[in-house]
Amino acid sequence: MFRSKRSGLVRRLWRSRVVPDREEGGSGGGGGGDEDGSLGSRAEPAPRAREGGGCGRSEVRPVAPRRPRDAVGQRGAQGAGRRRRAGGPPRPMSEPGAGAGSSLLDVAEPGGPGWLPESDCETVTCCLFSERDAAGAPRDASDPLAGAALEPAGGGRSREARSRLLLLEQELKTVTYSLLKRLKERSLDTLLEAVESRGGVPGGCVLVPRADLRLGGQPAPPQLLLGRLFRWPDLQHAVELKPLCGCHSFAAAADGPTVCCNPYHFSRLCGPESPPPPYSRLSPRDEYKPLDLSDSTLSYTETEATNSLITAPGEFSDASMSPDATKPSHWCSVAYWEHRTRVGRLYAVYDQAVSIFYDLPQGSGFCLGQLNLEQRSESVRRTRSKIGFGILLSKEPDGVWAYNRGEHPIFVNSPTLDAPGGRALVVRKVPPGYSIKVFDFERSGLQHAPEPDAADGPYDPNSVRISFAKGWGPCYSRQFITSCPCWLEILLNNPR
């Protein structure tokens, strides 16, 4: 039987969903670890899209490969076919149909909605409701959407647990298919391209009518359903999502007739962190001390840039972004630093949003990969390779936002993130896929200028500092931002 292209796209999207994979001992606090580079003793995990923050972060992996694959195949193996693996030891003999000479996996039909060639992916379980990870160990009971009981310690899975898993998976598949089948072929193409590129090609908006979808007895708006399916398996509520500034849902009314369901047009909001670190002798103003103009270790370009920023910040702009006389003034300038050396010229930003990246499949902005330096340390080279899709910096009505598009965390400090009246430096960790308001216009207006005796070295109340992959401050071995291999300085020009 011939199948339409639309049904093939729907099946490919279903196979591209992600599976949570718990990491033991993971914590997203600011107290050090290998991922943020505070200790630097072990290498980073393989570059996968680890979405989430806080304790128990999840590593999410695509069920299907990112490359296009022929979706035409035969029907069949609907029950047992949902359990598939990509290599590894055979199923336990306690499972029905797992004999010595044959296996349920051996009769897999390549075109079925739940099937995958053995060499394409290391994920061995299906859907969001899997009880076991790739190594065969029982999953944590707190896994999102996993409503079934875990396997008893003394034997195989009970019939009730298997039955409930299949029901939950079938419900998710039914709700997802009902939503995707409402989309036109062009919208499905856009959605698939965004999912398979992991946001490298976010594409346009995918608009759907606001529907009363329900999953597990709970409301599941389209943006929540697809965000949970393709990016954040632990996502619980739509209020945790923030539409990006270029999305239809950003400007549309909250109760409008349509909503964008492209999961890469949304970011996840950074929630409150653990209590601030204990009092430190370092203050936010001490952070700026290494950039003091009298510091003899600064290069000529650094000193020239700092002096120029104080006297005439409007004189600097990237050559390719030189504005005409009719264009409005830039709202910020971006400086890229490697440790204590500024690399390249200041990049002036005129548009509402700008991408700052090392390697991006499609798009424009500030490409850090094109900035050359004769001598780079090994730590800088490693960190530059982790920038990837980088960040999206946007000026919005309430402030300046930074969205982490990469696969590694970023670390942010700004005057409006510091505790009012506090002297301890506050550095916020932003996991992949999350966004944070790095500069709050309202809070900035309420803050008083620092007292003269408190200002130790140059202090700019309208600047933001962002480090890629490596943290700094009281909770890390790096006390100063200039100890970070790759970081940005965002110099706001007349905030608001």
Swiss-Prot record:
The biased composition feature labelled Basic residues covers 1-15
The observed outcome of changing residue 335 to E is: In AOVD2; uncertain significance
Cellular component terms per the entry's GO annotation: chromatin; ciliary basal body; cilium; cytoplasm; cytosol; Golgi apparatus; heteromeric SMAD protein complex; nuclear body
Tell me what effect the entry lists for residue 489 to K. Answer: Likely risk factor for CRS7; decreased inhibition of BMP signaling pathway
Q: Where in the cell is it found?
A: Nucleus
* Phenotypic consequence of residue 333 to T: In CRS7; uncertain significance; no effect on inhibition of BMP signaling pathway
Q: What is the effect of changing residue 306 to A?
A: Risk factor for CRS7
A Gene Ontology molecular function term for this protein is:
identical protein binding
Question: What about PTM?
Answer: Phosphorylated by BMP type 1 receptor kinase and by PRKX.
**What happens after mutating residue 435 to A?**
Loss of in vitro phosphorylation by PRKX
Q: Which InterPro entries match?
A: Dwarfin, MAD_homology1_Dwarfin-type, MAD_homology_MH1, SMAD-like_dom_sf, SMAD_dom_Dwarfin-type, SMAD_FHA_dom_sf, SMAD_MH1_sf
Q: Name one Pfam family in it.
A: MH1
Q: What is the effect of changing residue 187 to L?
A: In RUS; uncertain significance
Q: What is the effect of changing residue 490 to T?
A: Risk factor for CRS7
**Glycyl lysine isopeptide (Lys-Gly) (interchain with G-Cter in ubiquitin) cross-link site:** 173
Instruction: Write down which residues bear the modification named Phosphoserine.
Output: 435
Q: Which family does it belong to?
A: Belongs to the dwarfin/SMAD family.
| Assembly behavior | Interacts with NEDD4L. Interacts with WWP1. Interacts with STAMBP and PRKX. Interacts with RNF111 and AXIN1. Interacts with TGF-beta type I receptor superfamily members, including ACVR1B, BMPR1B and TGFBR1. In response to BMP2, but not to TGFB treatment, interacts with SMAD1, but not with SMAD2, nor with SMAD4; this interaction may inhibit SMAD1 binding to SMAD4. Interacts with HOXC8 and HOXC9. Interacts with PELI1; this interaction interferes with PELI1 complex formation with TRAF6, IRAK1, IRAK4 and MYD88 in response to IL1B and hence negatively regulates IL1R-TLR signaling.
Which disease is the protein involved in? Aortic valve disease 2: A common defect in the aortic valve in which two rather than three leaflets are present. It is often associated with aortic valve calcification, stenosis and insufficiency. In extreme cases, the blood flow may be so restricted that the left ventricle fails to grow, resulting in hypoplastic left heart syndrome.
Report what the protein is called: Mothers against decapentaplegic homolog 6
Q: Please report the organism this UniProt entry assigns to the protein.
A: Homo sapiens (Human)
Name of the gene encoding the protein in the UniProt record? SMAD6
